[in-house]
Amino acid sequence: MLELRLVQGSLLKKVLESLKDLVTDANFDCSASGFSLQAMDSSHVALVALLLRSEGFEHYRCDRNPSMGMNLNNMAKMLKCAGNDDIITLKADDGSDTVTFMFESPTQDKISDFEMKLMDIDSEHLGIPEAEYHAIVRMPSAEFARICKDLSSIGDTVVISVTKEGVKFSTRGDIGTANIVCRQNTTVDKPDEATIIEMNEPVSLTFALRYLNSFTKATPLSNNVTISLSSELPVVVEYKIAEMGYIRFYLAPKIEEDDEEQSLEYQA
């Protein structure tokens, strides 16, 4: 028996909105530690890892460790039927080929339940090694989203460079070029508005903006984003989910010579 009750139901809606355009089908894994997902996009250039810790749920029951295959667009459609203030409960019996979403209004005067068929999805769980990164940038998530959106109106790729001067986002296209520099700024009144740069050595990498713009759909989940860069590793774009966990996006850099994305090469 699986039963997960989330008082802040809007959080699950936001999670699905941030995933559904990147990944079509995925397995949600349930264990004593939490509700998680790991999946690659169809081109094997981007990977997403999600964790919602068990203690963040009002009620969390997971008798076995089921893996539930779901179509994320279908799941998002069901969750759109929930009000933003609704309490969302996920239920599945052991061995069942369906999952039930129950939505309760805060005043308990309306209860809806939607049943969705599960899928059999073959997916390898990839081992993502812990790594030391050359540079880590923490900045307001809305600012990062704005930069990616603005640059994508000029070019298709962005060069992210971190030096002692700050972090620079650059692009070029048919109509011209654009450069945006963000310097370290820790003196702001609100910590959420700070930009913090930790650099062990300078780094400069090129990425496809269409993927970064997809990642920024997670902006409503967190006020801040952490971007971890290293010359021989995929970039990690992480949004912390308050008191619950995180959503991390991994993106392979483009190879300068032929301007093609590398495939992610984590071990299954």
Swiss-Prot record:
| Record bears the keyword DNA-binding | yes
User: What's a single GO BP term from this record?
Assistant: translesion synthesis
Q: Which Gene3D superfamilies match?
A: 3.70.10.10
Subcellular location, in the record's words?
A: Nucleus
Read off the CDD domains from this record: PCNA
Picking any one GO molecular function of the record gives:
DNA binding
Give me the Gene Ontology terms describing cellular component: PCNA complex
The residue ranges marked as DNA-binding region are 61-80
The protein's job, in short, is: This protein is an auxiliary protein of DNA polymerase delta and is involved in the control of eukaryotic DNA replication by increasing the polymerase's processibility during elongation of the leading strand.
Family under the similarity heading? Belongs to the PCNA family.
**What protein name does the entry list?**
Proliferating cell nuclear antigen
Q: From what organism does this protein derive? A: Catharanthus roseus
High-level lineage: Eukaryota, Viridiplantae, Streptophyta, Embryophyta, Tracheophyta
